[in-house]
Structure formats: structure tokens, C-alpha cells
């Protein structure tokens, strides 16, 4: 059975795709078959610049259709059918992999805090723990802790679990303080420039 991790962010400024690249590269040191799956896409025509980037980094030879779940529109119109389609496609894709990096949606089509909730619901249904990526470039250490705690509550309310928190794009002037603050959380943490 494939191992997996679900990357999600609290907003688009977190730039989780950079974290995904680093995670994929690290996983390739330990696993032969590392794959990337996108459960929610903005467009039905298959254009997704994040997936296009990340599939060049993984080790799975598979068409993009195998790596995709469904669209925001499908979730809006038929949420149960959309979730089932994501589950079916994920189950088929993970058979090709030793480990799957699931890269959540990009805060483009779901209003407010609903996007993290959607990602948490998907992660819970996939049985995949979540790695939360925070925007370290514009939040103070105290704000990052508050954001991490709120994200964790939101995720756990949807019956998913958090295995770690990453503050991405932290200024070098605050990175030590961010690391110290995040270190108080009960999950693995990292702060990266």
C-alpha cells in the first residue's frame, strides 16, 4: 500500500508548490516510485501549472488524467459524486506508487476558509495525513502559531489529521523566532526561507 501526505495551505501566499518540490526530492532518496496527485483542479481542460511542474519531479510515468481528481465546478454541482471520483482516481493512481504527494487546491475558486475545509474533507476520505503550509513571508511568529492552530482545528473538524506545519518563505531576520514559535506545536514543524 502506498504511503501518502496531503499538502494544503491556508492561503495562496504560502506557495506550497515549493514545499512540494522539496518534499518530492527528499522522498526520492528513500522511495523508488514517488507520485504526485492533484485532487482538485480549477479547469476541466487539464491545464494546471502546479501539476505540470511537479510531475516532472516525480518518478511515475503516467498520463496527467491518472494524476487528477476533478474540478471545483464538479464539487460545487455534485459534491458526493466529485468526492467519489477523486477517491476512485486516487486509488488507481496510488497502485503505481510507493508514496504519493497529494497537492491540495490553490485558493482560486472556493471562498474564504472553505478551501481548507474542502482539502481536509478530501484528505480524510483518502486516509492521508496533512502537511499544512503557512505564508511565512507576511505573518509574525505569533500570527503563524494562531494560523497553525486554527488550521489544525479546521482540519480535525473534518476528521483529517495534521502531521506537520511548514512556514514557507520566512525572512532570514525572523526565521529563528518562527522556528522557536512553531516548535511549541505538537506536530513536526519547519520554517524555511
Where are these regions (language model features)?
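Extended hydrophobic/aromatic-rich secondary-structure runs
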Residues: 1-18, 122-123, 133, 153-158
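Loop/turn-to-beta-strand initiation segments
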Residues: 33, 96-102, 129
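Residues in well-ordered beta-strands of folded domains
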Residues: 8, 166, 193
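N-terminal phosphate/diphosphate-binding loop that engages ATP/GTP or pyrophosphate donors
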Residues: 2-96, 111-112, 141
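A structural preference for short, hydrophobic beta-strand core positions in alpha/beta folds
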Residues: 36, 191-192
